[in-house]
């Protein structure tokens, strides 16, 4: 698998995003790319870069994102990723619309560092298409509309990291319904559960007291799969407003995992969807599975 971690600075929030991203990637033995997307600089627009002649200080003047990537790289080394690699600007390669650092593969997974410039959503979308990432891990945008846009336009799973505290013992809230991505969400939840040594709560919520065949079948399938894998879990069928139940049940000490919604893409963009509203309102990390 291939994971992308998007960071914007060297602050505590970005460090927490790296913490949880590294831990999850380790559980999947996934290739890991750290991507910084900054404002567009005149130098990159004009192609006025000569990688062989630039010193690190010169690069940092024109591309402050390299300082962020070096900071992130050092954290990766602390976590045991790329232990024998060095941050060396001589290994920078300029490609169309992006700059990446070539790192040797010293473990069973590959580490990458990428610098892009321009609109966040547009550049994220280009990077996802360029490398076909399975999961994008990023901070949760403050604007709800941006969460909607990112969820809709990135054709991959998205992990919004919100209020993550590396010192907490997180549990997993697995939201189960009849959406086509639910089974994949269940499967991913077991891998993440093992990494965090976290118990899973499998939760199916119906707006009425009646649970349709699709909901019941999905709930039963999730129970059977979790039993087969041997993950500690409890299972709930609850009536109520799904988003409110998910958010209240999760609180701040859960990682919510749920499938992306099916249905009309235009209507989802205008009105949102159950997973999008959950990601917007939750006070904890949320993984929307594609």
What are these regions (language model features)?
Residues 59, 74-136, 228-266, 284:
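Structural beta-alpha unit
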Residues 1-62, 170-236:
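Small/aliphatic-rich secondary-structure junction motif
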Residues 61, 65-76, 219:
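N-terminal membrane-insertion helices
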Residues 13, 18-20, 25, 113-166, ...:
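Gly/Ser-rich helix-loop-strand patches that form or flank binding pockets
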Residues 202-204, 211-254, 266, 272-273, ...:
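Structured core of small recognition/catalytic domains
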Residues 101-105, 161-168:
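Short boundary motifs at domain starts and secondary-structure transition points
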Residues 21, 72, 124, 189, ...:
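Aromatic/hydrophobic pocket-lining residues that form π-stacking "cages" and hydrophobic walls in ligand
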Residues 41-42, 92-93, 144, 167, ...:
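Short secondary-structure capping/turn micro-motifs that flank functional sites
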């Amino acid at each position: 698998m291939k994971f992308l971690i998007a960071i914007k600075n060297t602050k505590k929030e970005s460090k927490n995003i790296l913490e949880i991203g590294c831990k999850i990637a380790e559980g999947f033995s996934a290739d890991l790319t750290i991507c910084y997307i900054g404002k567009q600089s005149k130098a990159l627009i004009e192609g006025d870069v000569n990688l062989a002649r630039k010193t690190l200080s010169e690069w940092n003047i024109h591309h402050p994102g390299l300082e962020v990537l070096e900071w992130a790289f050092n954290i990766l080394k602390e976590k045991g990723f790329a232990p024998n690699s060095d941050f060396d600007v001589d290994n920078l390669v300029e490609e169309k619309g992006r700059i990446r650092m070539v790192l040797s593969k010293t473990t069973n997974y590959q580490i990458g560092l990428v610098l892009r410039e321009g609109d966040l959503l547009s550049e994220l979308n280009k990077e996802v298409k360029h490398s076909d990432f399975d999961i994008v891990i990023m901070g949760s945008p403050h604007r709800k509309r941006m969460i909607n846009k990112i969820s809709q336009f990135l054709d991959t799973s998205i992990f919004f990291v919100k209020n993550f505290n590396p010192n907490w013992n997180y549990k997993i809230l697995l939201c189960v319904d009849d959406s086509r991505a639910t089974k994949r969400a269940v499967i991913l939840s077991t891998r993440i559960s093992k990494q965090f040594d976290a118990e899973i709560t499998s939760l199916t919520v119906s707006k009425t007291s009646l649970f349709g065949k699709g909901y019941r079948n999905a709930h039963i399938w999730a129970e059977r799969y979790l039993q087969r894998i041997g993950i500690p879990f409890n299972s709930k069928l609850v009536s109520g407003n799904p988003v409110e139940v998910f958010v209240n049940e999760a609180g701040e000490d859960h990682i919510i995992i749920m499938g992306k919604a099916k249905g009309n893409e235009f209507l989802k963009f205008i009105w949102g969807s159950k997973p999008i509203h959950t990601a917007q309102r939750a006070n904890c990390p949320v993984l929307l599975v594609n």
